[in-house]
Amino acid sequence: MTKTDPAPMAPPPRGEEEEEEEEDEPVPEAPSPTQERRQKPVVHPSAPAPLPKDYAFTFFDPNDPACQEILFDPQTTIPELFAIVRQWVPQVQHKIDVIGNEILRRGCHVNDRDGLTDMTLLHYACKAGAHGVGDPAAAVRLSQQLLALGADVTLRSRWTNMNALHYAAYFDVPDLVRVLLKGARPRVVNSTCSDFNHGSALHIAASSLCLGAAKCLLEHGANPALRNRKGQVPAEVVPDPMDMSLDKAEAALVAKELRTLLEEAVPLSCALPKVTLPNYDNVPGNLMLSALGLRLGDRVLLDGQKTGTLRFCGTTEFASGQWVGVELDEPEGKNDGSVGGVRYFICPPKQGLFASVSKISKAVDAPPSSVTSTPRTPRMDFSRVTGKGRREHKGKKKTPSSPSLGSLQQRDGAKAEVGDQVLVAGQKQGIVRFYGKTDFAPGYWYGIELDQPTGKHDGSVFGVRYFTCPPRHGVFAPASRIQRIGGSTDSPGDSVGAKKVHQVTMTQPKRTFTTVRTPKDIASENSISRLLFCCWFPWMLRAEMQS
């Protein structure tokens, strides 16, 4: 369905920081193409986009012969051409230079505004440089033509309070940033925008993960220590990689690179914590833990509130410095042990959390009431249990028997042996099939065959088989997550034990993605996701900017 523009609305009053400019004069219709260009800019009234009769599509396609007739027809008015430019589709945005030239041929002043969006041709040109939807080359051609005719870089849209440089930074078009700043006044590069907490173009590029635009702005003298209304420098508005979903691996890498770039650009005199803090990147994680009296597998307290098990300590790809990875007892975390496509440890979803080393402390767990710490006893007959926690076999010694292949050696902290019935996380019942070290995480792990198909695998993880069970019946758990509820279900003659295929020590995080795309590809995705920014109605434009 073809969307049409609503009745013209008066744009909001100008903000305090908008540059002084000549008064715009409303004009009812566009002048004839043969008329000379006006001396003063005007605001053109809103009009619907023209379409050919019996046209099959809902958008204007400049490549279609019928649409070309309308585009080059002298009777097509400037407001109608502005309505075409507003359509956020590749067919239109790739021809921004052609459409813009037609607008100029009709006598349009270089600083004329679209009455619906309050945007000038230069604003539209910068928006049309977005990768994926627009064409940077076509946008640069039109921008150079407009600047040569005297287009004002400082003009702002009264709906978004953004100038042309802000649009170029938001849509990550470094070529346009260079064109706009060439010959512009020095204060333009650090001009702020109220819709981005009075941040500069560098703040806008940082918050939108526009690495190319940020580099270009720094090359042209953008101030990396300028603070917005919240007191943040550009490095502090870069999205946190740990808050990104697992399918945003490339974006997390861009966020890390962008933050590092902006931090290194900040002068040392600026009181930015990340710059002034010492760098522990080269300190091994085990030394850091030893200094704190901790080791992997210890129970820890995070921020004095959340308890969990320490699973990782070391440097990461998502941020500089030393980080600890904790498997929380409850699903109150943010990940499953991986961030930005890089796996550091394994835990159930929403139970993994990364934090700085200073935020953890050793937790003292109360001894569990249902599991005692006494040595393992022979298989129990529950018919002879006389009371809670009291059994008639007390004091009896375990009768030696020939161990099966699946039996375990006595280890500190072991609560069950192969063949024992256990309860996992207080919910799932199963039988222990494996106990020992694994390749996928440090420490000792129990491999359990669950009674119901609520597991995650068939006894193998990352190509290493630890035991055999039906698909989706296998699960691994640390000792703190299991509780023995019965004796062994295997007879002494059982010959199937869990045999590990091979032993390797995992020293590097394992990536869960195979390809890394360029920042330009990422910018394309970001541009596609910004369609709402350029929707048809100005109140939706403003809502997008405020979000």
UniProtKB/Swiss-Prot annotation:
Residues 367-377 have a biased composition (Low complexity). It comes from the Eukaryota. ANK repeats lie at residues 117-158, 160-191, 197-229. Its main location: membrane. Transmembrane segments: none annotated. Residues 1-49, 365-413 are annotated as: Disordered. Residues 16-27 have a biased composition (Acidic residues). SUPFAM superfamilies: Ankyrin repeat, Cap-Gly domain. Pfam families: Ank_2 (PF12796), CAP_GLY (PF01302). A lipid is attached at C534, C535 (S-palmitoyl cysteine). The modification Phosphothreonine is found at T374. It is found in: Cell membrane; Cytoplasm; Golgi apparatus, Golgi stack. Residues 387-399 have a biased composition (Basic residues). Residues 314-356, 436-478 form the CAP-Gly domain. GO terms for biological process: cytoplasmic microtubule organization; fat cell differentiation; membrane biogenesis; negative regulation of microtubule polymerization; peptidyl-L-cysteine S-palmitoylation; positive regulation of apoptotic process; positive regulation of D-glucose transmembrane transport; positive regulation of endocytosis. Functions as a cytoplasmic linker protein. Involved in TGN-endosome dynamics. May modulate the cellular compartmentalization of AKT kinase family and promote its cell membrane localization, thereby playing a role in glucose transport in adipocytes. Homodimer. Interacts with AKT1 and AKT2; when AKT1 and AKT2 are phosphorylated and activated, affinity is higher for AKT2. Interacts with ZDHHC13 (via ANK repeats). Interacts with ZDHHC17 (via ANK repeats). This is CAP-Gly domain-containing linker protein 3.
